[in-house]
């Protein structure tokens, strides 16, 4: 993805889990 959810993407890689954030578009 990109933009504001860059932190969430990093967390996904560390936890090996996919997390969805509301209001943010994940590419």
UniProtKB/Swiss-Prot annotation:
The record describes its post-translational modification as: Contains 8 disulfide bonds.
Which compartment or compartments is the protein found in?
Secreted
Metal-binding: present as a keyword of the record?
Answer: no
Q: From which domain of life does this come?
A: Eukaryota
Q: Which UniProt keywords apply?
A: Calcium channel impairing toxin, Disulfide bond, Ion channel impairing toxin, Neurotoxin, Secreted, Toxin
Q: Name one GO molecular function term.
A: toxin activity
Task: Output this protein's name.
Answer: Cysteine-rich venom protein tropirin
- Its source organism is Tropidechis carinatus
């Amino acid at each position: 993805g990109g933009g504001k959810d860059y932190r969430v993407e990093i967390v996904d890689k560390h936890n090996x889990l996919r997390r969805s954030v509301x209001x943010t578009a994940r590419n």
